[in-house]
């Protein structure tokens, strides 16, 4: 089973680079699918998305599929995956955290995720495909993610980070490499088939503590501006209209959630997959202030 060919859907995803690094030297046949005309990861066999979607290049029979695609996109591709052995797909804990958001667009996103989860489970059950759905929490890699790296860019640019006081909502950031570990375990663990598992990083920490560690990773003293949520909403709405805070992409719901505990029960995933996630430490061996795309390339 562990020698099954691997088909990675979503080759430009944040996690893809780490998957490729972990698969090197394993002897497994690897095929990458992405919306590119050339492979986004040098040295890996590559199939353009358009060719797989059109059926020009069929999925390898018996392959273990790892999907990094948004779930609704994966659902549209399922007819082209008939004959594969298993699918390990990434969902999101946003299916829970955004279900009661004060923004209609976020509630709609949660609804689409929930519908896609059901569709994936139904299709895999009908076609005899082993399915494992992994819902990661806040995913980061200290380089190009939309969470930690984006906050770090804001801190670099402005020298401070605004927080909705007291910013005590708990978070469980998970590194992209730990997500890759969990996915690789999932495709080869029959006991995980049919499961929807939440996965997260090490010990939870408050939103405020997370931002303080980001400053430490930049080698800077934390400068936090703690304000009421209502004031931050108005200020960032105005800043967005003026084009001053596009990088941060803060919406009103982001500030509201800074004081919500977005933690999830991950015991089943840890027990079944054994991915042993690292603690959140941007000031650790891979220092946030020193990392760039070339560093990631060197790691792989």
Language-model-detected regions and their locations in the chain:
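Active-site Tyr-X1-5-Lys
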Residues: 107-133, 142-145, 149
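Mid/C-terminal beta-alpha module of Rossmann-like enzyme folds, strongest
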Residues: 185, 189-249, 266, 271-300
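Substrate-positioning beta->alpha
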Residues: 145-150, 165-187, 194-198
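NAD(P)-dependent short-chain dehydrogenase/reductase
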Residues: 138-170, 214
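N-terminal Rossmann-fold cofactor-binding loop
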Residues: 32-37
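NAD(P)H-binding glycine-rich loop region in Rossmannoid oxidoreductase-like domains
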Residues: 38-84, 89, 93-103
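N-terminal Rossmann NAD(P)H-binding glycine-rich loop of SDR-like oxidoreductase domains
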Residues: 5-26
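Conserved sequence/active-site signature of Rossmann-fold short-chain dehydrogenase/reductase
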Residues: 95, 139, 179
């Amino acid at each position: 089973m562990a020698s099954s060919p691997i088909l990675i859907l979503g080759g430009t995803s944040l996690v893809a680079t780490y998957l490729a690094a972990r698969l090197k030297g394993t002897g497994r046949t690897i095929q990458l699918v992405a919306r590119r005309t050339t492979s986004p990861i040098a040295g890996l066999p590559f199939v353009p998305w358009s060719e797989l979607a059109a059926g020009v290049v069929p999925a390898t029979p018996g392959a273990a599929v790892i999907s990094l695609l948004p779930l609704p996109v994966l659902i549209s591709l399922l007819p082209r995956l008939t004959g594969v052995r298993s699918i390990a797909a990434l969902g999101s804990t946003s299916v829970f955290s955004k279900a009661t958001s004060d923004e209609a667009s976020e509630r709609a996103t949660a609804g689409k995720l929930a519908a896609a989860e059901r569709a994936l489970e139904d299709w895999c059950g009908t076609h005899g495909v082993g399915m494992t759905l992994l819902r990661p929490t806040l995913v980061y890699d200290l380089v190009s993610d939309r969470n930690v790296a984006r906050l770090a860019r804001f801190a670099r640019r402005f020298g401070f980070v605004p927080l909705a006081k007291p910013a005590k909502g708990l978070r469980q950031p998970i590194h992209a490499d730990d997500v890759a570990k969990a996915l690789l375990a999932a495709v080869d663990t029959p006991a995980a088939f049919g499961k929807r598992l939440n996965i997260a990083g090490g010990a939870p920490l408050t939103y405020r503590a997370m931002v303080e560690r980001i400053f430490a990773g930049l080698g800077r003293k934390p400068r936090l501006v703690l304000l009421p949520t209502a004031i931050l909403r108005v200020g960032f709405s105005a800043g967005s209209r003026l084009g001053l805070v596009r990088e941060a992409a803060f919406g009103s719901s982001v500030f509201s959630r800074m004081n919500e505990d977005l933690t999830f029960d991950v015991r089943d995933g840890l027990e079944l997959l054994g991915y042993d996630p690292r603690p959140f430490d941007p000031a650790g061996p891979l220092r946030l202030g020193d990392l760039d795309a070339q560093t990631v390339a060197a790691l792989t």
